[in-house]
Amino acid sequence: MSKESIYGLTMAQLTDWLMERGHKKFRATQVWDWLYRKRVTTFAEMTNVNKDCLQLLEDHFAIETMSEHVRQESKDGTIKFLFRLQDGNLIETVLMRHKYGFSVCVTTQVGCNIGCSFCASGLLTKNRDLSSGEIVEQIMKVQFHLDQVGKEERVSHVVVMGIGEPFDNFQNTVDFLEIIKDHKGLAIGARHITVSTSGLAHKIYEFADLKLQVNLAVSLHAPNNELRSRIMKINKAFPIEKLMDSINYYIEKTNRRVTYEYILIKDVNDHKEEALQLAELIGDKRHLSYVNLIPYNPVDEHSQYQRSEPEAISQFFDTLKKKGINCGVRLEHGTDIDAACGQLRSKQEKKKVKVN
């Protein structure tokens, strides 16, 4: 039977777990330090923790529950990791290098059921949720890589934008955020963390009430219901009116800016008309809104969709700017590897099917 990842415990949970079994509170602090500051990969390396405590941890938990299966490195320094989980499933994690530090994009589910018509992640439907420990371990695996190559750098930013819908795995995602923010551990600043949702409106309300101080991004991709329902089936459950109500609640509750992700697809959602509709949709919340324009990464299985022409991207950007909307065109990473989210995993799963 597979052991639970120790990375899945918050500091409070680890403390309670050890104290319930007769150990002093300071033991949890020691273990936490070994895990996240000294970054050991075995319990035996925790030299100042007594043998009884180490044996208890060894009997119940694992530090490593996934292994590197494939790694792709881009000329721009982006690295895409494909990790194999204990049950044989594969997940993607991406390391991106920026002027301001190292950012990691994590996955929250094995597959995705949101079913956006342009996305590689949904080519393989959801198998299961990841545990909070499996999400944290993605960060640790990337940090181990940075340690090994001697960069003397740390993961400074996290985006929860990999395969899956984070708000469909809500509690594990929230626990993950608490663990990586802990100031005695990885100490990743809340304002350096962004969680992206396809628009589960009821969970946006819940997320707002938690006041976590992390950034929220919403995958919008269309400014009206007719178009959004056509390319994102989630819109049928949470149409734009409901989605915007939840976003407005989030803004009022947190006074934090919301980022709207908008993938530009040629002749689908990249016209001036859509840019004007988007500006109108954001309306008087423009001071706490930012539109992230993303040139589409073509996917073989969705050949009906193509990247917008540079002229269309410029026109869309200029139209938003003239309407007073804060926006930018996302700097691309890993264009010479399987850049689209879910692309590498999908290719590897197809290879497994052919072999079998």
Curated annotation (Swiss-Prot):
Cofactor binding remark: Binds 1 [4Fe-4S] cluster. The cluster is coordinated with 3 cysteines and an exchangeable S-adenosyl-L-methionine.
Cellular location(s): Cytoplasm
Q: Which residues form the signal peptide?
A: none
List the GO molecular function terms. 4 iron, 4 sulfur cluster binding; metal ion binding; rRNA (adenine(2503)-C2-)-methyltransferase activity; rRNA binding; tRNA (adenine(37)-C2)-methyltransferase activity; tRNA binding
What domain of life does the native source organism fall in? Answer: Bacteria
- Where is S-adenosyl-L-methionine annotated to bind? 164-165, 196, 219-221, 297
List, alphabetically, the InterPro entries matched.
Answer: Aldolase_TIM (IPR013785), Elp3/MiaA/NifB-like_rSAM (IPR006638), Methyltransferase_A (IPR040072), RlmN_N (IPR048641), RNA_MTrfase_RlmN (IPR027492), rRNA_lsu_MTrfase_RlmN/Cfr (IPR004383), rSAM (IPR007197)
Give residues annotated as binding [4Fe-4S] cluster: 112, 116, 119
Xref: SMART domains: Elp3
- UniProt cofactor(s): [4Fe-4S] cluster
Which family is it part of? Belongs to the radical SAM superfamily. RlmN family.
The name this protein goes by in its record: Probable dual-specificity RNA methyltransferase RlmN
What organism does this protein naturally occur in?
Shouchella clausii (strain KSM-K16) (Alkalihalobacillus clausii)
